[in-house]
Amino acid sequence: MVTTQPPEILGLLSDPLRWQLVVELGRSDRRVGELVQLVGKPQNLVSYHLAELRRTGIVSARRSSADGRDVYYRADLFRSRDLLGEAGHTLHPGLSLAPSPRDTVERRRARPRLLFLCTGNSARSQIAEALVEHRSAGTVEARSAGSHPKPLHPNAVRVMAERGIDISDRPTKSLTRFARNRFDRVITLCDKVREICPEFPGAPIAAHWSIADPAAAGDTDKATYPAFQHVADEIDSRVTLLLADLETRPLERTHRA
């Protein structure tokens, strides 16, 4: 009789605390102190399990650009999907992860409204807004703004043009412009903006994507362009997951300005 060990991912996520941590990080990037409050466990225990999750690559970490003493954790949901898919294949080659059912009636009834925020509204939030509009084919309404708007970065225009999306004529906007508007979700892409993000009417769902400023990666547009490509790829991956979430789960709130 041949015995086999179950795939590591199954043992890793069978722990209730690790599962809860991945679920929370799938919703928003978090600092360890926030995770401690959310799961109600001691920090040393949470840190231990985060280290185990990082070892397999389904959780990663980056130093906060707002405060270098802080670290933001994020879940790599595509990595989780791949590992779980491999586990299903190990059980039987005919098994695969089935897509979640789509509630098309609910999707047609409510058009989600999203607001993306960063410091300058010159790159990250603009990229996110454009990708949502493009990938949702207009079924999701997206807006973007910054705490201290500055001109659109030429590398943001270039990296989106390579994806067939023209953002060259988009204005940059201050977040105060949307202070009285209602959104279903408000997503910060900058650690600094997260610290000062105001409350919006109707208490929209808030999430944070801790993404480094690509313009800070070098002194010239040529030097920073690889960082812009990396950031655009990361935002595109997150937008793909966000749109899937909006498609498969009924909106908890439906707001209009």
Region roles according to the model:
Residues M1-Q5, F78-F116:
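Amphipathic alpha-helical dimerization/coiled-coil segments
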Residues T4-L45, D70-F78:
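N-terminal helix-turn-helix DNA-binding core of bacterial DNA-binding proteins
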Residues L50-A51:
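Short, hydrophobic-biased segments on the C-terminal half of alpha helices
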Residues R55-A66:
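Beta-hairpin "wing" of winged helix-turn-helix
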Residues R102-T176:
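Conserved active-site segments centered on acidic
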Residues G120-S122, D191-R194:
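Short glycine-rich anion-binding loops that position phosphate/pyrophosphate groups of nucleotides
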Residues R180-R182:
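Alpha-helix C-terminal capping/helix-to-coil transition sites in glycosyltransferase folds
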Residues C197-A257:
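Phosphate-binding/catalytic loops
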